[in-house]
Regions:
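A cross-family acyltransferase "interaction/gating" segment
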Residues: 65-72, 103-107, 114-196, 209-227
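Alpha-helix termini
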Residues: 96-104
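Eukaryotic intrinsically disordered and solvent-exposed regulatory patches
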Residues: 16-21, 25-26, 39-42, 63, ...
């Protein structure tokens, strides 16, 4: 994963760990990793920290090479058409991981925004990753480009974006690890509240604003044929 991260231009990677809250062995176990989502480089970057399973779109399984590894990592594939109860799959995986934590089951990484963004703010979180009411480990990723090109994969078609990513001078990446977030009784009973409070905590620690928009707004925009062009 070091090679893949370097190949995607992540030349400088720094991990910043919060010094507040319980440390190391004192930390409660969190079966879920929650992160913002900026680029496809986010996945190998999280893999450098540990080897979690990933929640991914169902069509990811059909992508050559990537689909093979996604299945090997025991990813949870979600169907946005609603034909498969994705929330139930995610919730059950979290419960199974928590029950088998002593057996070394990989944690489940969720990009809670449900899509990629430009990384300048946190859009509203989807509730699926919070339905189990179990603790989560938040991470906040940020990129800084050494050239004019942004690695954010938010509104450019895939092949042009990959071409410019591989052609750029590279990026510096900062990964902020927050304390494990343990939900209150009220948050466990209300996944929407739990998701929003985790988003607020991530925004506060990362000094990142919260945006009043969600992944469906982005999909609606792209559905109208709005894509970013490289000048």
């Amino acid at each position: 994963f070091w090679g893949l991260s370097l190949g995607l231009g992540c030349w400088r990677i720094r991990v910043h760990r919060s010094t507040t809250g319980p440390q190391d062995g004192e930390r409660p176990f969190a079966p879920v990793i929650v992160s913002n989502h900026i680029s496809y480089a986010d996945i190998p970057l999280l893999m450098l920290l540990e080897l979690p399973s990933i929640v991914a779109k169902s069509d990811t399984a059909a992508i050559p090479f990537i689909g093979f590894y996604a299945r090997a990592w025991q990813c949870v594939f979600v169907d946005r058409s609603g034909k498969v109860p994705s929330v139930d799959l995610i919730r059950q995986r979290q419960i199974d991981i928590n029950k088998n934590k002593d057996a070394g089951w990989p944690r489940l990484a969720i990009f809670a925004e449900g899509t990629t963004t430009n990384g300048r703010s946190l859009i509203q979180f989807q509730r699926g990753g919070f339905m189990s009411g179990l603790p989560v480990q938040p991470y906040v990723l940020s990129y800084r480009s050494y050239s004019w090109f942004s690695p954010a994969f938010e509104s450019m078609n895939g092949l042009p974006h990959l071409f410019y990513t591989l052609s750029t001078l590279g990026f510096a990446v900062d990964i902020l690890e927050l304390p494990v977030y343990v939900p209150s009784e009220e948050e466990r009973a209300n996944p929407a509240l739990y998701a929003e409070n985790v988003r607020k905590a991530m925004g506060t620690y990362a000094k990142m604003p919260l945006a009043d928009t969600n992944c469906w707004d982005k999909l609606a925009l792209l559905g109208r044929g709005v894509h970013r062009k490289v000048e």
